């Protein structure tokens, strides 16, 4: 794309327009600045609310992929890529899933998480190459993230995923973008002009984080990773999480702390299994077998 074409493209983007509410923000004091930022941030949940049907559809596709052995793969550049990596990295400790079940890829690789990598987002071929490096297949779901909706790196990845007949999702902040036209499901969280013109790490980034939270949380709930609203598959890998596992067992069963701790010990610190043991009266092996028959869904296992 020529410089002139790029300038014209940017001029048409909602995220690149100037915000009338912050036009003189450099004349304000600290309290006034943060008030404007906070006021603008209030528009973000509403923008995400308009996308709920598309988000729910994406969740259904992700769950179908998980049940068939597929993965959820996020890909993005800059802030968008970092948010994808962040959401993916939280899934193993929160839900006890393998680290490759939800994958985050950022343009420029690991170094780009902390340092800007010049030109990384401009290479569509690298987007495809990074998917090839993780052996992306038609069983997987690709979620491309870019506020602009035009990032070449992400577009390259989406086109490659489409060529494999994989499900593709685009999360953008500009309606009718190139990514929207490629993806099977378009989540267009249009938050309007940023407080600082073009700084899409702000409202656009916040909207992206809310959407990513929904995608993984809803998918994991449907996969049986929660009981009521408790994270029963949490990995008790540190002192805080071990204490949380005890509380989860106590809350789910209304048992004492001593019973929760003793049952967790017998259940190898598996909170879901411990809850099954307490509520069903079954021993570890039998409780585990019942859970397996119900694909790890505790509520269904208890209802048998």
From Swiss-Prot:
Top-level taxon: Bacteria
Active site: 90, 121
GO molecular function, one term: carbon-oxygen lyase activity
EC number, UniProt record: 4.2.1.126
Broad class of enzyme this protein falls into: lyase
InterPro entries xrefs: Etherase_MurQ, MURQ/GCKR, SIS_dom, SIS_dom_sf
Keywords: Carbohydrate metabolism, Lyase
UniProt xrefs under CDD domains: SIS_Etherase (cd05007)
PROSITE patterns in alphabetical order: SIS
Residues in SIS domain copies: 62-225
The protein's role, per its UniProt record: Specifically catalyzes the cleavage of the D-lactyl ether substituent of MurNAc 6-phosphate, producing GlcNAc 6-phosphate and D-lactate. Together with AnmK, is also required for the utilization of anhydro-N-acetylmuramic acid (anhMurNAc) either imported from the medium or derived from its own cell wall murein, and thus plays a role in cell wall recycling.
Protein family according to the UniProt entry: Belongs to the GCKR-like family. MurNAc-6-P etherase subfamily.
Other remarks in the entry: A lyase-type mechanism (elimination/hydration) is suggested for the cleavage of the lactyl ether bond of MurNAc 6-phosphate, with the formation of an alpha,beta-unsaturated aldehyde intermediate with (E)-stereochemistry, followed by the syn addition of water to give product.
Subunit annotation: Homodimer.
Listed name of the protein: N-acetylmuramic acid 6-phosphate etherase
Organism: Actinobacillus succinogenes (strain ATCC 55618 / DSM 22257 / CCUG 43843 / 130Z)
């Amino acid at each position: 794309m020529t410089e002139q074409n790029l300038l014209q493209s940017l001029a048409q983007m909602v995220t690149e327009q100037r915000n009338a509410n912050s036009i003189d923000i450099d004349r304000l004091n600290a309290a006034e600045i943060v008030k404007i930022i906070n006021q603008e941030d209030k528009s973000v949940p509403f923008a995400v609310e308009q996308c709920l049907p598309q988000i729910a559809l994406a969740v259904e596709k992700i769950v179908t992929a998980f049940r068939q052995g597929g993965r959820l793969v996020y890909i993005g550049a800059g802030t968008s890529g970092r948010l994808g990596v962040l959401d993916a990295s939280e899934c193993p400790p929160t839900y006890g899933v393998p680290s490759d079940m939800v994958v985050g890829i950022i343009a420029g690789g690991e170094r780009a998480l902390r340092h800007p990598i010049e030109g990384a987002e401009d290479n569509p071929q690298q987007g495809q190459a990074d998917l090839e490096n993780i052996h992306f297949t038609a069983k997987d779901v690709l979620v491309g993230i870019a506020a602009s909706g035009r990032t070449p790196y992400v577009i390259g990845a989406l086109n490659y995923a489409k060529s494999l007949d994989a499900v593709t999702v685009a999360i953008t902040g500009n309606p009718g973008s190139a990514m929207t036209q490629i993806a099977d499901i378009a989540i267009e969280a249009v938050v309007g002009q940023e407080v600082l013109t073009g700084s899409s790490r702000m409202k656009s980034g916040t909207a992206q984080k809310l959407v990513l939270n929904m995608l993984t949380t809803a998918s994991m709930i449907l996969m049986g990773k929660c009981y009521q609203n408790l994270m029963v598959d949490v990995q008790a890998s540190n002192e805080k999480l071990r204490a949380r596992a005890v509380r989860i067992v106590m809350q789910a069963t209304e048992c004492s702390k001593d019973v929760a701790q003793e049952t967790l010990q017998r259940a190898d610190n598996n909170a879901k299994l411990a809850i099954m043991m307490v509520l069903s009266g079954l021993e570890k092996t039998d409780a585990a077998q019942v859970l397996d028959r119900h694909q790890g869904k505790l509520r269904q296992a208890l209802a048998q």
